[in-house]
Regions:
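Hydrophobic, well-structured mid-protein blocks that either form specific transmembrane helices
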Residues: 97, 101-137
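Generic N-terminal amphipathic, Lys/Arg-enriched alpha-helix
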Residues: 27-38
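Divalent metal-dependent phosphate-bond-processing catalytic cores, especially two-metal-ion Mg2+/Mn2+ enzymes
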Residues: 20, 36-45, 49-62, 75, ...
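Short, Lys/Arg-enriched N-terminal segments with co-localized hydrophobic residues
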Residues: 10-19
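Short polybasic linear motifs
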Residues: 5-9
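His-Asp-centered metal-binding catalytic motifs of divalent-metal-dependent phosphohydrolases/nucleases
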Residues: 66-84, 90, 94, 111-121
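An active-site-proximal "capping" alpha-helix that borders the catalytic cofactor pocket
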Residues: 51, 90-100
Length: 233
């Protein structure tokens, strides 16, 4: 495993009474590092690791189950429809990993439910049922904001052959899940179609504060981008 941060959070989870063997966090970290070894479009291993770190920090403040939050955060993209459409519906890879490591049926159900609630799906997006789900959803959405969010947006757009910006292509809003997944637009439009909608979807107070700061940074960046696009000095 690379880096010391997961170890810090893992030890803290154990100290707070987590009932699952702490080695599963190590194994999950190694597992997702291998799964995403060839992913460079914004949903890579380092995205997963950032979501894990942020989710567990939020979970501490919200008194949520750190083990459930940590595992759901680490595994949240393993069966993502964009990356593994053949396993998406039943969370096959997530379930197989958890069963292999002795997770209870209740924990597997909880983690799979959280993962199913994470994604932004336009007007069909859901509010997680549990505080653990809210922590993971907030962490995943926070990683789409700020400086990292900008970099990820352009990395994803470039890897999928999207135009950075075209003033003649207007953003589409109020899309449902099907429309959102099928929609092809520019990377700049993605700011309006998704990224600038995330702040108001945050569930926890700590995430709301971070989201506001990061959104302001993105708006300042986009203003500068559009000025430079027009050749303004």
């Amino acid at each position: 495993m690379t880096g010391s941060e997961p170890q810090v959070h893992r030890d803290r989870a154990v100290k707070q009474g987590s009932f699952m063997d702490k080695t599963i966090i190590d194994d999950a970290t190694d597992y997702v590092k291998n799964v995403f070894r060839n992913e460079f479009g914004g949903h890579d291993y380092f995205h997963t690791l950032r979501v894990y770190k942020t989710a567990t920090k939020i979970a501490e403040q919200e008194n949520a189950d750190l083990t459930v939050v940590g595992l759901a955060a680490l595994l949240h993209d393993v069966d993502d429809v964009k990356l593994s459409p053949e396993t998406h519906a039943n969370k096959d890879r997530t379930v197989a990993f958890l069963k292999k490591h002795g997770a209870s049926e209740a924990m597997i159900k909880s983690i799979c439910e959280i993962i199913g609630e994470v994604s932004f799906l336009g007007t069909d997006s859901v509010v997680p049922k549990t505080i653990e789900g809210k922590c993971v959803q907030d962490a995943d959405r926070l990683d789409a904001l700020g400086a990292i969010g900008i970099a990820r947006a352009f990395a994803y757009g470039g890897s999928h052959g999207r135009v950075m910006h075209d003033p003649d292509i207007k953003p589409s809003t109020n899309m449902n899940a099907t429309e959102y997944r099928k929609h092809v637009s520019t990377t700049v439009n993605h700011f309006y179609e998704k990224l600038f909608l995330l702040k108001d979807s945050m569930n926890t107070d700590s995430a709301k504060k971070i989201a506001e700061k990061r959104e302001n940074y993105m708006k300042a960046y986009l203003s500068e981008f559009l000025s430079e696009w027009e050749g303004l000095l």
